[in-house]
Amino acid sequence: MWKGADTSFPFADSHATTYSVRDGSDWETTLKPRLRERLRNSKNIVLVLSSTTANSRAVREEIDYGINDQGLPVIVIYPEYDSKESLLANGSLKQPVKSLWDRLPIFRDSMSKVPTLHVPMVKVAIRDALSNTGFMIATKCNPDYYWYKT
């Protein structure tokens, strides 16, 4: 979306680092190993979380392996929120935002192990998050929930 139109946008698609797989590929012998290889070569996980996010086997595996095995920080993008302020109530994440975590129980239950940065679907906020060294594996900050203050 933004990466193609803005070459300065700090996003590297880890899916492009391994060769493609076909829809009919076997989960255990092809898909799961490729997903894990991508995660081992990643500096963080970018999770787009909304009311329509599916708790699929691939998403569960990516979150579980990425957080619980690799310790990757997570940048959570909420497409249903369009400003930093819209995520917050009284300086903290709103309950409807936190309720979205229930869409992915493995994320909800594991996210306290790594730094997680919560941002709205706003280009500048996402750019700041992707450039923030506290949310990169080699330089990550302490495990906690983070968001940009308004």
What are these regions (language model features)?
Residues 52-69, 86:
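Conserved TIR/SEFIR loop-to-helix hotspot centered on a Trp-containing motif
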Residues 75-77, 89-90:
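An exposed acidic His-Trp-rich patch
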Residues 69-75:
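A short helix->loop->beta-strand "cap" motif at the edges of active sites that frequently abuts
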Residues 80-82:
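Class I S-adenosyl-L-methionine
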Residues 47-51, 77-78:
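Conserved beta-strand segments of the P-loop GTPase G domain that flank and frequently precede/overlap
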Residues 26-29, 84-150:
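C-terminal interaction surface of TIR/SEFIR-family domains
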Residues 1-41, 139-150:
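Conserved N-terminal substructure of TIR/SEFIR domains
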